[in-house]
Amino acid sequence: MQYILVVEDDYDLNQAICYSLKKSGYGVYGVTFMEKGKQTFIENQIDLILLDVNLPDGEGFSFCQWVKKQREVPVIYLTARDMAVSY
């Protein structure tokens, strides 16, 4: 089974994404804070991260940079921002 980490601070959106992914057969960890995302990433084998850019305890971009220093994992940003930024 492949495991997806959803880091999204909007609780309802987080739950909806997790529900949809679980129904599609994925293992899912849903968190609403960056620090909890780091802890979950360290403690579990994560195959993909769906990551919000704006989080209550930091920016998703810094979380992504931290992840890339740990190991190579695909990251898809979830955001309503209107500017493209490459990291």
Describe these PLM feature segments.
Residues 1-87:
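N-terminal/domain-start alpha-helical segments
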